[in-house]
Amino acid sequence: MIVVLKQNPNRHQLESLIAWLQEKGIIIHTSIGEAHTILGLVGDTSQLDIDLIAALDIVEDVKRVQEPYKNANRKFHPEDTVVQVGNTQIGGGNLTLMAGPCSVESEEQVGAIAKAVKASGATMLRGGAFKPRTSPYSFQGLGATGLEYLKVARQETGLPIVTELMDLSQLPLFKDVDVIQIGARNMQNFDLLKAVGHQDKPVMIKRGMSATYEEWLMSAEYVMAGGNENVILCERGIRTFESYTRNTLDLACIPVLRKLTHLPIIIDPSHATGKSWLVDPLAMGAVATGADGLLIEVHNDPAHALCDGPQS
């Protein structure tokens, strides 16, 4: 349920309303916009009398929210969320470029790529230290050593780093990471989502390869319910009957999510296609459709990359 307040509501009446709602076990999320203040109510709102609340002098409107996601819902939070990462703002009309190697292979490799992508306009460095691979025989990443190489590259370039967390046991190693990425395969790892919900750093959730919009937003809801409201959504292609490309990039998600949620939307055209020659046109299409940023795989020697060279 959401309660839309009139402009400049009486402070005493507002405090009384909030106290009454809290007595009934309702959790209140306040969103202050340019025109109105909105109270988002989470809990058993079936016990609340809409007409009684609507009759209050300070209330302009009361609406029930049917969607299961509340914190991530634009009805709760009409203004776009802007996630601050260092000097970079993600969302709110800003275009963020995250670029770097699929896998960190060496200190020299990630350092050289970091300098190159910064010179090309990137504002964040992506790189995988822990890699979820379809085959157990594929390169699995350098692990903690890879994280240290990313930190060195950050120190040399000033670029904040975004890297994937695969398991709860790895969380202590991520205390110096700027943005935690939850990969497509872990989009519904609810224990992991709960854990990052208690972290004081942004979380980027990649869409599962067969996930609906609602399932994706419910994953964001898990993180936000833990108190972490700095959530970013990343579309990386979904699985369809088409096999020419690695996945199928769902650009329709951008206007749909723009309607459903206030969270920033990043597009990953590299994983979506698996082919480097498709990255440019799909990146441009994503920006034209209204994406808040791009996640691009870059390698200084794609032919000899240990992971995903063809799409870099």
Annotate each PLM feature.
Residues R126-A144, H299-P310:
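Glycine-rich, proline-tolerant flexible connector loops at the mouths of alpha/beta enzymes
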Residues L95-P101, T123-G127, I161-T163, I180-I182, ...:
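Hydrophobic faces of well-ordered beta-strands that scaffold small-molecule active sites
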Residues M1-L97:
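Non-catalytic terminal accessory/regulatory regions of metabolic enzymes
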Residues F139-T163, A195-P202, L251-I265, Q311-S312:
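Alpha-helix-loop-beta-strand connector modules within alpha/beta enzyme cores
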Residues V83-C102, K131-P136, R258-I267:
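N-terminal small/glycine-rich loop or linker at the start of catalytic domains
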Residues V85, Q199-V298:
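Catalytic alpha/beta core domains of metabolic enzymes, predominantly
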Residues K6, L142, G158-S169, D178-D191, ...:
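Catalytic beta/alpha-barrel core
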Residues L95-A112, P136-Q140, P160-E164, G183-R185, ...:
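Active-site mouth loops of central-metabolism enzymes
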